[in-house]
Amino acid sequence: MARQRPTLALGLAAMLLLAGGALAQDTRFSLDFGYQWLDVTGNEDLYRSQVNQDDGFVVRDFHLSNLRAPGDVTGWDRLVIDAAGLGASPYGYLRAEMGRAREYALRLNYTRAEHFSALPALANPFIDDGIFPGQHTFDRTSDELDVNLELLPGRTVTPILGYRYYRLEGPGETTFAVGQDEFLLNEDYDYTVQELRAGLAFNLGRFTAAVLQGWREIEATSDLTLAPGAEGGNNANPVLGQDVTMSSYSRTSTTDGTSPMTHVYLSGLVTKGLRVYGTYARADQESRYQEAESLSGDLASFKISRFFSGRDEVAAAKAKADDWRGQLRVEAALGSNFDLVLGYDERHRALDGTALVESLYTGVSTFGGLAAPDVSRILDADTLGDRQEQQLSARLIARVGRPLTVWAEWASADQDILVEPDASEIVVPGNQGGSFERSLDRLAAGATLKFKRLELGLDWLSDEADTVVMRTDYLDRERVRGRIGFTLFKWLRLSATAAQISAETAIPGIDSDTETEQMSVDLDVTPSDNFNARVSYSTYDTDSTITVRIPQDLSLVPSLYLAEGELWDVALNGKVAWFDLTFGWSSYDNVGSFGFDFEHALVRLDFDFSKRVGIGLLAESYDYQEEVLAEIGDYLVKRYGVFLRLHN
């Protein structure tokens, strides 16, 4: 199962080099690395989709810090490097900070993540035949680098420079519907983002501010080809007496976009007891899309009422999105027992796009078998969407004596939405576009009661809207939450939380209704600095219904989702002399629309031979079972590891 991760060798070499050069000085250093291996039983693809640990070498933890006295002749007085997960892990990072007080501050963050999905039941027409995974899968890797430099930090004016690079690439599988059938395709995907930013931060005594301007560039490429063995498609039934097959398929699409971004921040103390905050952010994105597609086979189309043996298609599209948001908040102290917070929030988003698609059908014949001329089709579509929202809010906080704090909040939002779809996009007539207005009012209140050993909290929120625009909008929503914390002794604390959320849209054709209840209890025992135990129990129950449209015949039917989950979580950590033992166990059982059981157990032992050298042992298991997909939806994975620990 081992997969190559080239960042491990590079990262480990860099860590040892940095440590070797700094250990002779006043430096804190620790490195925990070793080898881990897996024993996989069951569906390995499903395990990788959810957990994705691997065989191989891995850096569990690395830390290096070097702090120097002011005035030292070296290039820094602060150097901190942290890393974890590099190697046989689905997520790894390296973070570094270096600087000199009031001269510069440099931060570097690097992350690497593996993204894998191969679910057995997703887009799988052959699951009843025991064939899995489904036909929508991907196996991709992302790398992200972010560098930020501040010059003269903490002074009146601080210049800021930054750069960000992100890349996501790798293969995948998808399906494409054409010729009255659906075919499996292989995909090679590459997505890259580069971003430059520059700005100034201001420290003006009682006021601080920052202005940051960024420029983002996006490039994406997707290459699709017919998967080997997929010539017959997913549907074996003939169409009007003819078998539908595809002998070749290729599509290359590219997307590129640019986006200038602006961010402004202001915070200040106007006078004693009066503070203001303000932010403004804007991003204007322009993107262009191009596509070239070619396919051949024995295919049928009811759109042109013909059989055909080939199709060539080119597409070009462009879109422009303008997005901005501004916020203003004022906090005022009304005496010693009352605070008033006033807020205003306004946001706007406009999306305008055009698309041109030209299709040429070749090798055309009528459904009766007579030869016919080639068919050319042109689609020219223009769409527009615009959304404007303003919100006013006010919160009053009152302290009634020392233990009791109560608060109340009011907010009102107005939304103006414009949707202009192209006629070619409309499948079901009616309510596809137009100008809409929606108002949303919120009332909320809460209280907190604190004693020496007891803390109680309760809050309530209610949202009411006059209409809905999107099917996911709601007319009414209510939430009630409560919490309690009780410290029986210094070393023993018991806490509990509970919440109930309900949302409803009683409009024919939508008929959505959601009820969610959640409860958790936590017990924390810490009799000494060398021992800690925590036990947690949680329940989760949700019922959700909404009317949906069946794409095959456009009929309306109710959709119901049910979930009832129960979670146990236990964690123990103890340290005796040079031994450090960690034990963890959790179990989550869910019944309802998607029933499954997941159990995770971990035992970790760290033993230091001396003040500088030690070893670590790890044993871990993941046990997952699905109720509907018995066997093909199950896996049991055991992970073992041996690690070397170096520190000073």
Q: Where are the language model's segments positioned?
A:
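Bacterial N-terminal signal peptides
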Residues: 9-19
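Gram-negative and organellar
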Residues: 26-29, 35-648
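Bacterial N-terminal signal peptides that target proteins for export
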Residues: 1-10
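Sec/Tat signal peptide C-region and signal peptidase I cleavage site
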Residues: 20-24
